[in-house]
């Protein structure tokens, strides 16, 4: 699951497919479907942390697909502010 978190927007394009490992852990995989089907197929027993992670991943994917001018400005300012503390170099 760790490798899948590197590119969350790619994961968020489908419905959830749950697989059980030998040790009893559940593995979540996403397959291609639209957002309504994604929400409909979420298991009712999924814990809140996993559901929150899926929601955040889906929002990141939507942002990359169709960013608004306001969200772009916010994103740029967040990235620029920490680096602006160092000042400009010639």
UniProtKB/Swiss-Prot annotation:
Signal peptide: none annotated. GO terms for biological process: symbiont-mediated perturbation of host apoptosis; symbiont-mediated suppression of host cytoplasmic pattern recognition receptor signaling pathway via inhibition of MAVS activity. It is found in: Host mitochondrion inner membrane; Host nucleus; Host cytoplasm, Host cytosol. Residues 65-87 are annotated as: Mitochondrial targeting sequence. Keywords: Apoptosis, Host cytoplasm, Host membrane, Host mitochondrion, Host mitochondrion inner membrane, Host nucleus, Host-virus interaction, Inhibition of host innate immune response by virus, Inhibition of host MAVS by virus, Inhibition of host RLR pathway by virus, Membrane, Modulation of host cell apoptosis by virus, Viral immunoevasion. The keyword Disulfide bond does not apply. GO terms for cellular component: host cell cytosol; host cell mitochondrial inner membrane; host cell nucleus; membrane. The record marks 66 as: High pathogenicity. It holds the Pfam family PB1-F2. Belongs to the influenza viruses PB1-F2 family. Plays an important role in promoting lung pathology in both primary viral infection and secondary bacterial infection. Promotes alteration of mitochondrial morphology, dissipation of mitochondrial membrane potential, and cell death. Alternatively, inhibits the production of interferon in the infected cell at the level of host mitochondrial antiviral signaling MAVS. Its level of expression differs greatly depending on which cell type is infected, in a manner that is independent of the levels of expression of other viral proteins. Monocytic cells are more affected than epithelial cells. Is not encoded in all strains, and seems to be dispensable for replication. Oligomer. Interacts with human SLC25A6/ANT3 and VDAC1. Interacts with host MAVS. This is Protein PB1-F2. It comes from Influenza A virus (strain A/Turkey/Ontario/6118/1968 H8N4).
């Amino acid at each position: 699951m760790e490798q899948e978190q590197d590119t969350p927007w790619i994961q968020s394009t489908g419905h959830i497919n749950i697989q059980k490992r030998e040790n009893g852990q559940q593995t979540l995989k996403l397959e291609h479907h639209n957002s309504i089907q994604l929400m409909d197929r979420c298991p009712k027993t999924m814990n809140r942390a996993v559901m929150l992670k899926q929601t955040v991943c889906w929002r990141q994917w939507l942002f990359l697909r169709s960013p608004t001018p306001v969200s772009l400005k916010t994103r740029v300012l967040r990235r620029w502010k920490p680096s602006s503390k160092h000042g400009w170099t010639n």
